[in-house]
């Protein structure tokens, strides 16, 4: 089997907060004794910003300046050069998650154009004839709960052909009236988005009603900025011609890692929106957009 390197983090869910201590063990397993030139462990947190293809042409100068933003970087030497015995060797480690100056530990977030990631990397250096060994492991950071009281912000909405924007042929749209409400557009990330929708009337048959969660990522610097909206998830809340006057529940859970508390910094922004999408026969698409503010309490 050769020599295997592994990193085991103490917490099963791998979730940590600023100010806590990240601890665990590095495990070296081998059938025979292993000669090595030292073992080191690096903790790194970075924000990777990427521009969409449509922006690259416009922002060539800007493209080069979107380099990863380092949040945290720390390396410790775990073992000096020597020899590991055969079998399994466990080396404990501890990393305090403290930041110098006014840096902030942003929450882990996997987006399309903004990626916030925290990793542990263990390197075992070996002699020229044997290959160096490397093992990487991701851990998750949750931002501190927001200070102050959380206040919900309910929204009532009415959708008719007259309320729609960006409609070229308004006269060609069938008549319809949809009402509903969202219980709050200020959302706690660990709680679902809820509300209800009622189809009061519609001349055309309804094919489907969907909820679409959208991320809006903005990357920018002195030369300009690029703003891109992409879909995170799409949930169908009604299929077929919905009964008129029937209350259709709106319920959406925010997915882990793909959402984070709404974030705004000097270099990038991560915001979220929800679209209520109604498909009418034959192929009319009605969309109502609601900006959301996500937070952790």
UniProtKB/Swiss-Prot annotation:
Function: Component of the commander complex that is essential for endosomal recycling of transmembrane cargos; the commander complex is composed of the CCC subcomplex and the retriever subcomplex. Component of the retriever complex, which is a heterotrimeric complex related to retromer cargo-selective complex (CSC) and essential for retromer-independent retrieval and recycling of numerous cargos such as integrin alpha-5/beta-1 (ITGA5:ITGB1). The recruitment of the retriever complex to the endosomal membrane involves CCC and WASH complexes. (Microbial infection) The heterotrimeric retriever complex, in collaboration with the CCC complex, mediates the exit of human papillomavirus to the cell surface.
Keyword tRNA-binding included in the entry's annotation: no
Source superkingdom: Eukaryota
Name assigned to this protein: Vacuolar protein sorting-associated protein 26C
Tissues/organs with expression: Ubiquitously expressed.
GO cellular component, one term: endosome
Stored PANTHER family: VACUOLAR PROTEIN SORTING 26 RELATED (PTHR12233)
Localization: Endosome
Gene: VPS26C
Family: Belongs to the VPS26 family.
């Amino acid at each position: 089997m050769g020599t295997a390197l592994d990193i085991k983090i103490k917490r099963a869910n791998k979730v940590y907060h600023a100010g806590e201590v990240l601890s665990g063990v590095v495990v070296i397993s081998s059938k025979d004794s292993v000669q090595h030139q030292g073992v080191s462990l690096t903790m790194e947190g970075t924000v990777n910003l990427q521009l969409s293809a449509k922006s690259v042409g416009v922002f060539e100068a800007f493209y080069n300046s979107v380099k990863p933003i380092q949040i945290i970087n720390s390396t410790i030497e775990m073992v000096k050069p020597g020899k590991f015995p055969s079998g399994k060797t466990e080396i404990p480690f501890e990393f305090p998650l403290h930041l110098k100056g006014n840096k902030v530990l942003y929450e882990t977030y996997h987006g399309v154009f903004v990626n916030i990631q925290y990793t542990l990397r263990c390197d075992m250096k070996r002699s020229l004839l044997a290959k160096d060994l490397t093992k990487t492991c991701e851990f998750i950071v949750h931002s501190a709960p927001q200070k102050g009281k959380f206040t919900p912000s309910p929204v009532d909405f009415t959708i008719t052909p007259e309320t729609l924007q960006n409609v070229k042929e308004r006269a060609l749209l069938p008549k319809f009236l949809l009402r509903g409400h969202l219980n709050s557009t200020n959302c706690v990330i660990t709680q679902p988005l809820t509300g209800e929708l009622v189809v009061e009337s519609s001349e055309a048959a309804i094919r489907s009603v969907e909820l679409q969660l959208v991320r809006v990522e903005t990357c920018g610097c002195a030369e300009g900025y690029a703003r891109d909206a992409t879909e995170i998830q799409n949930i169908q809340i009604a299929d077929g011609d919905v009964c008129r006057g029937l209350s259709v529940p709106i319920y959406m859970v925010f997915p882990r890692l793909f959402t984070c508390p709404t974030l705004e910094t000097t270099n990038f922004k991560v915001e979220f929106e929800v679209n209520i999408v109604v498909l009418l026969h034959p192929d009319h698409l009605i969309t109502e957009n609601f900006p959301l503010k996500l937070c952790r309490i």
